[in-house]
Amino acid sequence: MASFNSFPIPKQIVGSSSSSSSSTSRPRILVRSSLTSSMTSTNSMLVFVHPHPLIKHWLSLLRSDQTSFPIFVRIPMTSVVATRWSFLSSVKEESRIYQNDSLKACGCASVSPYTAQNNVYVELKDPKENIGVGSAERSYSSRSMLQYNLLAKNLLALEETFVALDSVRMERDIMLQMGKLGAAELFKTCLSRYRGSSITSCLSDTTELVDTTPNQQVFVSSRRKVKKKARRSSVTAENGDQSSLPIGLRTTWNNIDVPRVRRPPKYRKKRERISRNETEMSTGVKIVADMERIRTQLEEESGKVASLSCWAAAAGMNEKLLMRNLHYGWYCRDELVKSTRSLVLFLARNYRGLGIAHEDLIQAGYVGVLQGAERFDHTRGYKFSTYVQYWIRKSMSTMVSRHARGVHIPSSIIRTINHIQKARKTLKTSHGIKYAADEEIAKLTGHSVKKIRAANQCLKVVGSIDKKVGDCFTTKFLEFTPDTTMESPEEAVMRQSARRDIHDLLEGLEPREKQVMVLRYGLQDYRPKSLEEIGKLLKVSKEWIRKIERRAMAKLRDQPNAEDLRYYLNQ
């Protein structure tokens, strides 16, 4: 007889019966594996079941006799073998639980196997065979009917189990594809959020099977939401949330002055660190400024570039210490310029549209930062950014006053012009004076009337001589503007007459005296020369040339025709 492999039926398959309530034995389905070559080639198995009464009645129309006959159902062997081992894991676990349950009685106490060679069978007798032959046969028939009902339920449970196994396989395939796509963690998170949904409830049995497999999938819920709620609750507790108080007590709670501990701001340490760094940086800038001032003084005294040794000797230190101080100062200067870039950009917006490029304004702002760092004193309690704003504005305004106009105006006049403009705006807004007099402006600003009038002359608009006179004219201002460099005919005649009279006057002097006077005042080439130059030309000292000049001037004053030259001075 062939060997059989037996395994317990899970709880979905096992039914209960009153006739077998006292029995504690578990029903088993006996399965014999096919070992012959014919079974291997067909890859199938036969299951023998007893026919239902309706099926039997339908078959009676085709057969004359009412004898019972077995029904064989062919099932593919590949599907049975594939599902057998995955099914055994869950069945064995459940069998341990239900073996101790005495309330679960087994209805099919006796199962007579019907074996055939090279096949697997499960045999149940016909419940209606030989009706009315005896009480023993009736009891056997009733037991057979009960066994058939239990078998139908078992087959239905087996079908549901196979469907669940397909779901497990499909879920594994989904997890494998998600892992290849790199979205396994996201899929697990989304699946854990809907843990209590209907999809999870439908796959509850499947989850038990997955937990027993070696490739166990563990779904860990995120604690981000829990941490967020905890932070909100802590913030609410610190702020004194009154949502838990009754409505009548909330107004009373608002009126109570609760003493609170004054905590230092979080950025206090940061502010202290920034101020300390600014103090150190300004100290380094001062060191470099002092060293450069010493070098400039040496170069002015010696008239040449100062060497490193002379520079170190004048500073009272060795060359190594001098280079160390210079490098430290240069580093501090660069860091200070970088840290104040945002402040310089903010202040440069006020000087846009005044004829200066934005890059030039930024450079002027950096110069102001270095000037302020040289004069910054941290012991007064002011921040460096507050103190240096004045120097940044001053440097930018100085550049605007120097290069914004085509005609250069001194910075003192520029300040006076700014004061005048502010005074006019004040008189217009407060007193309603649209055109204020110079005396009123002088009284308000404190400047003299003469200085205010000189400043008003500088406020005139400077235009181009190549600009057209009007929109309808093609004539330019250059055509109407006189050329002051050209002499008029009257001036040319007067100049020639004066030169002739001077030469006639010099004829009464000695040749050496006449030569010195011509070179001294440029009467020949219109280029006057100094005493030293004349001495080099005549190869004498400049003191000797001075004596000759004095003697010649004394002779010219004593001549009678010298009074005739006064006519040219009055013209």
Curated annotation (Swiss-Prot):
One of its GO terms (molecular function) is DNA-directed RNA polymerase activity. Residues 1-32 form a transit peptide. Induction: Slightly induced by blue light, especially after dark adaptation. GO terms for biological process: cellular response to light stimulus; DNA-templated transcription initiation; regulation of RNA biosynthetic process. Residues 1-25 are annotated as: Disordered. Residues 531-550 bind DNA. Highly expressed in leaves, to a lower extent in cotyledons, and barely expressed in roots. Present in seeds, seedlings and etiolated plantlets. It is found in: Plastid, Chloroplast. GO terms for cellular component: chloroplast. A motif (Polymerase core binding) lies at residues 360-373. InterPro entries: RNA_pol_sigma-70_dom, RNA_pol_sigma70, RNA_pol_sigma70_r2, RNA_pol_sigma70_r3, RNA_pol_sigma70_r4, RNA_pol_sigma_r2, RNA_pol_sigma_r3/r4-like, RNA_pol_sigma_SigB/C/D/F. It comes from the Eukaryota. Residues 16-25 have a biased composition (Low complexity). Signal peptide: none annotated. Keywords: Chloroplast, DNA-binding, Plastid, Sigma factor, Transcription, Transcription regulation, Transit peptide. The keyword Cell cycle does not apply. Belongs to the sigma-70 factor family. Sigma factors are initiation factors that promote the attachment of plastid-encoded RNA polymerase (PEP) to specific initiation sites and are then released. PANTHER family: RNA POLYMERASE SIGMA FACTOR RPO, RNA POLYMERASE SIGMA FACTOR SIGC. This is RNA polymerase sigma factor sigC. It comes from Arabidopsis thaliana. The lineage of its organism: Eukaryota, Viridiplantae, Streptophyta, Embryophyta, Tracheophyta.
